[in-house]
Amino acid sequence: MALNLAQSAAAAACFATAGDARRAASVVAMPSSSSSATTSLRMKRQAACEPVACRAVARHVAAAAASSRRNGVPVFVMMPLDTVSKCGSALNRRKAVAASLAALKSAGVEGIMVDVWWGIVESEGPGRYNFDGYVELMEMARKTGLKVQAVMSFHQCGGNVGDSVNIPLPRWVVEEMEKDNDLAYTDQWGRRNFEYISLGCDAMPVFKGRTPVECYTDFMRAFRDHFASFLGDTIVEIQVGMGPAGELRYPSYPESNGTWRFPGIGAFQCNDRYMRSSLKAAAEARGKPEWGHGGPTDAGGYNNWPEDTVFFRGDCGGWSTEYGEFFLSWYSQMLLEHGERVLSGATSVFGDGAGAKISVKVAGIHWHYGTRSHAPELTAGYYNTRHRDGYLPIARMLARHGAVLNFTCVEMRDHEQPQEAQCMPEALVRQVAAAARAAGVGLAGENALPRYDGTAHDQVVAAAADRAAEDRMVAFTYLRMGPDLFHPDNWRRFVAFVRRMSESGSPREAAESAAHGVAQATGSLVHEAAVALRS
């Protein structure tokens, strides 16, 4: 007979490992009745993991897992991008969400991450917020016993790696951007990018009397007030969106309409009138007004490589000249100041005992990392070169606000990437980890692309958990919940991965052996989740 959701989750908890189950069973108080028949019946029920006895076992296993996680790295799982309907009033695929959350809980996952889309919640007009669909999700997570990382997603969904749905910015925001195209990031050829409002107008009251930063802060305040009863208990982290894909960066490598293709260097985004005005003032203050007319004109196009350009070439390119230093310092400083402004708003909302930590995501731009100029990082706003650490200033900015640095591409290995593009994700992760450590901020991680194989899991465990306590990541968020995750083989490996993370790097073989019981116990539940997610 198929188990229902609660029974499946309880059964999985019982079978998390054979050893855990045996140890847990040994502490369950047995009845004092002298009736051997009654005792036998109760023992059979316990062995079958029926709720009457299994709850005690499950509580013991959960407590053991929680204790283990204190020494390891908690794992969260990203929800589908379209978890909440575009009208904001309901969950999409409610049955699939319920089954999926129960399965994740059974695997020992700490919680979920969900995008709280500005374009959904405030779509009807300024200050008109509809969180109904998210309330349903939070209640479901609380009932299941999962924590939540809530992402304040102030960007458009669509046009980036992994974007499977389209969720634009709020309609009233888009209307203002259509009236004034300079509210959008703009490249040197006049191409506009509507993924995220240009940081150049952060302090301009361009949205019906409000600045963009005020819009973001008001949204976060509305979220806090609406979910006050969940904060600190169920909602344990607020990730603050800072740019395209929710990352603190410029939209320098947009995939939409084939503009950019990996591993192109991207393009600077500083040609809207607000950015040009700032650049002009900075150039005049430097005593070089001729530098204030726009960004470099010899930096190539989106799909060039560094050596194709004059600006990014070798040691003698424009990036290493006095002008290059001036421009790149200004460009990266504008991004840092944007982060300061938005984080100041976030801490004013969530900083007074709200109970949830704040985090910011930084992009893992690993291609051409082995070159001197690090061109793709420069166009994205990270002034990181062979001779300069571009991540330490970001980490220090986050430290001033007590925020966690969330970094991507943790699953990648150098040799898996095209070597001709000098991709070095492992070295990049090490550099960012060192910057976080030096600045005294917590480092969390994500995988940049969906991976379900043991090799990727090994890499994450090595980078995040299998190290000295002070160097471990504070959390890892797994991309992403979907039918592929619930494929039987993928699921078994994932359960083992979660166990290894919680135990700070236990061997893969032992973890996979222990995960076999969970995979068996949750088979029907996982199948239900996979089928429902495909519907």
From Swiss-Prot:
GO MF: beta-amylase activity
Gene Ontology CC terms: chloroplast
Pfam families, sorted: Glyco_hydro_14 (PF01373)
Top-rank taxon: Eukaryota
Location of the transit peptide in the chain: 1-36
EC class: hydrolase
Record localization: Plastid, Chloroplast
Keyword Plastid among UniProt keywords: yes
Keyword Transit peptide annotated: yes
Location of the active site: E247 (proton donor), E446 (proton acceptor)
Assigned EC number: 3.2.1.2
Keywords annotated in UniProt: Carbohydrate metabolism, Chloroplast, Glycosidase, Hydrolase, Plastid, Polysaccharide degradation, Transit peptide
Catalytic activity: Hydrolysis of (1->4)-alpha-D-glucosidic linkages in polysaccharides so as to remove successive maltose units from the non-reducing ends of the chains
Thermal dependence of activity, per record: Optimum temperature is 35 degrees Celsius.
Primary role: Possesses beta-amylase activity in vitro. May be involved in cold resistance by mediating the accumulation of maltose upon freezing stress, thus contributing to the protection of membranes.
Name of the molecule in the record: Beta-amylase 1, chloroplastic
Organism the protein comes from: Oryza sativa subsp. japonica
